[in-house]
């Protein structure tokens, strides 16, 4: 899992991995990159991983995340979306179709949601199959994002296979000039 660091107005916020604490913590940066202060706690008594904060072109704010709803701590199978109504995360409206995805091959986030060069919204997701975490990545194009509807299509897959030296891969982040991927190689 990854900490989601993002700008929110003039603030820099971070959502670190806190699934074991059964809550989601939002931290505010006091002095980048080393000084942070707890700003808000949401989703108390729930186990979440890989939360993404995203602002669409219309200014709507969204949280995308993966929640475990069973005793086995499965965070791979379901994607949930919430609309963030205010600037303090006090009011979160659940998407009407939550969970919007139920499928371990595409549900779990694998990095920040971003706009590609064509202006399309892209959501990296993990391929978790064959009882293998990090089997591969998808790049999904979000084609519909409203409080009532959500649709995405896979446009690219990067999978562990015989022809690749990859043993595992589960994170993709698009920077301003670089792409960052974590991977485990076979030697």
Where do the protein language model's features map onto the residues?
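Carbohydrate-active catalytic/glycan-binding domains of CAZyme proteins
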Residues: 1-187
